[in-house]
Structures are given as structure tokens and as C-alpha cells.
Design a protein with these regions (language model features):
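Non-heme di-metal
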Residues: 1-100
Length: 100
């Protein structure tokens, strides 16, 4: 469970960082489009880091279930973490789309 907590917190941190960078991009947009695009790219990288952490967490749960049997509780926790991430990520993605 400590790994689930650790990786969940790391994923939230990545989303918060992505939000910070996309906000910086929005502010820089009017004064320096090139810098704004750089901040958008950094925000995308932060979300990619979150995706990698989610993959690691999912593999951890799968390994746990291989050793201990299928666990509804573990799947519920994984789904809950994914739901939280999705809810937090949605406004970041919406802001990113304004740069497309």
C-alpha cells in the first residue's frame, strides 16, 4: 500500500506541475509565443511523466495480484486513483487545446 500512496502522490504532483506550466504558457502567450509554446511542451512532458507513473503503479498491482490472487480492493484503488487523475487533468488538457 505504501507504493500505491507514493506513486499516487507523484502522479498528482506531475499534474499540478503540468497545470503550473500551462498557466505560465497562457500568461506568456500575449508577450512571447515561442516561450508560451515551450511551457506547453513542458506541461505535456509532465503529463507524460504521470502516464509513466500510472503504468508503473498498474504493473505493481498486477504483480501483487499474480502473487496474492485477484483483489477487488486493489482494482478499486487503482480505478479511484485513475478517476482522481482524470478529474485533475481535464482542465490542464482543456488549456492545452487552446494552443492547437
Amino acid at each position: 500500500m505504501d507504493k500505491i500512496k507514493k506513486y499516487s502522490k507523484l502522479m498528482i504532483d506531475e499534474i499540478l506541475d503540468a497545470n503550473m506550466y500551462i498557466d505560465m504558457a497562457c500568461k506568456a502567450r500575449t508577450s512571447n509565443e515561442e516561450i508560451a509554446e515551450d511551457f506547453v511542451e513542458i506541461a505535456k512532458q509532465e503529463l507524460h511523466h504521470k502516464d509513466i507513473l500510472h503504468k508503473v503503479l498498474k504493473e505493481y498491482v498486477e504483480d501483487y495480484e499474480d502473487k496474492n490472487g485477484k483483489s477487488v480492493e486493489m482494482e478499486t484503488i487503482l480505478d479511484f486513483v485513475a478517476d482522481i487523475n482524470s478529474d485533475m487533468e481535464a482542465p490542464v488538457i482543456a488549456k492545452m487545446k487552446t494552443f492547437e
